[in-house]
């Protein structure tokens, strides 16, 4: 049978691999490269070449069992990855990272009341999400959810929106229109609202180009 596959992201390529064992496959791709969200850029730095993933970067065994099995089937080597989060807002006016020490790496944060307001809402967000599964209404976007639950602008603009934008490679303005239920369910499933338990992240050795 002749089968056409539209798109060469992981879904298209994995389907092509399996179906090609018994059928004739043709892949249609609008871009000049295969891979979709997986894209490794090589940066030449003096005598060293650094490989940087611009899209797909990490995965974990808990949330991506099919991907883990697929990589194992292809004999793709993976390694442990260190996942961290840091923010630099308004040309360095506010800077912090996820560790306790990193929170106050910028010494003026000790005396910044707005910073403490953000931290208070981060704690409330973690507890609220873990205990009540966020209590999100149907068809409610992230902006409406944050307003309804009285989360501060400091928490939204300097923590949740930057983190969400980084995860989905999406402009900050668009993140606010995301369905709150989908976004917050992702946070819960990936244990991003758990202070103590975090998933063990892995990445493809040599970049997703492998």
Feature map (PLM): residue ranges:
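Short acidic-hydrophobic surface loop/beta-edge motif
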Residues: 40-45, 85-89
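Glycine-rich FAD pyrophosphate-binding loop
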Residues: 20-44
